[in-house]
């Protein structure tokens, strides 16, 4: 019976051409959908390179009526650096906060991205997501360090180990005033620059557009990084907060990690109310 049906279909193949075309289109579309769903499921299961559980992102607001003169060091200290440091200190000392960090640059789960090109020979350029961070950032986000783990294994205090406003959110090891600048690069960027992700500690590279005047030293290599659950792994570079952060009065983000037992359903509401009261 089946043979008879197949024979009849073959004999009427000219008249049923549209049917075969329709089946082919359905098959291709179904294959495409299944392939896409498999890709999403596979990407979701891959580590992101950071841990956002019990992590909150805070936005600082400024007083638009308060003019701060960039040319006046006293004005910057009184109305910008000191209030920001005080706000950061209060956030760190809030009950239930395990750690806190300040950062700027490429954000996760958003379209806010900052890119820059880097090179080792002025010929080939490798683009990377840029993130400027205080040294506590690696503890807050729990970023796995593949090489150079000793750099952030100690108890880093952003204020005790620094002097002056230019290093307010740095440390002795994470110093934005030294040359070459320390940088933590992802495995992908290490492989793009040096064609290997191992044994690159201490190696130097520089900004493709600024030339060798802006040099970086690999202080550590972190795990693969991606911007959201379903994104592909991308090249990332993390470095100390730059000098223009202080000159231009940039308003940073603050990320905090809350202890699991303190991260209740009303934590965000309670935190906002008590910190602004």
Explain the meaning of each model-derived region:
Residues 2-10, 87:
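A short amphipathic helical element positioned immediately N-terminal to and/or at the very start
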Residues 12, 91-95, 197:
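Acidic-histidine catalytic/liganding microenvironments
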Residues 12-42, 50:
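Short, strongly hydrophobic transmembrane alpha-helices
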Residues 87-88, 180-181, 187-188, 210-277:
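"Rare, low-scoring activations can occur
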Residues 124-236:
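Hydrophobic secondary-structure segments that place a key small or acidic residue at a functional site
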């Amino acid at each position: 019976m089946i043979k008879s049906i197949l024979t009849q279909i073959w004999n009427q193949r000219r008249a049923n051409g549209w049917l075969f075309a329709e089946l082919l289109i359905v098959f291709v579309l179904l294959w495409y959908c299944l392939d896409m769903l498999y890709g999403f499921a596979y990407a979701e299961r891959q580590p992101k390179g950071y841990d956002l559980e019990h992590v909150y992102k805070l936005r600082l607001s400024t007083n638009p009526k308060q003019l701060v003169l960039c040319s006046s060091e006293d004005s910057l200290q009184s109305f910008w650096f000191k209030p920001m440091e005080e706000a950061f200190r209060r956030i760190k000392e809030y009950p239930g906060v395990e750690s806190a960090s300040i950062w700027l640059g490429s954000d996760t789960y958003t379209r806010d991205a900052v890119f820059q090109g880097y090179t080792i020979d002025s010929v080939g350029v490798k683009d990377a997501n840029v993130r400027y961070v205080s040294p506590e950032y690696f503890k807050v986000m729990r970023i796995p360090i593949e090489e150079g783990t000793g750099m952030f294994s100690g108890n880093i205090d952003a204020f005790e180990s620094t002097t002056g406003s230019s290093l307010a959110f740095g440390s002795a090891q994470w110093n934005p005033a030294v040359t070459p600048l320390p940088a933590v690069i992802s495995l992908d960027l290490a492989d793009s620059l040096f064609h290997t992700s191992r044994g690159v500690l201490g190696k130097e590279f520089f900004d493709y557009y600024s030339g060798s005047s802006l040099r970086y030293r690999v202080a550590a290599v972190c795990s693969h990084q991606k911007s959201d659950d379903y994104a592909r792994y991308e090249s990332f570079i993390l470095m100390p907060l730059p000098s223009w952060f202080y000159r231009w009065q940039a308003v940073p983000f603050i990320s905090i990690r809350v202890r699991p037992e303190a991260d209740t359903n009303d934590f965000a509401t309670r935190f906002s109310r008590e910190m602004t009261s």
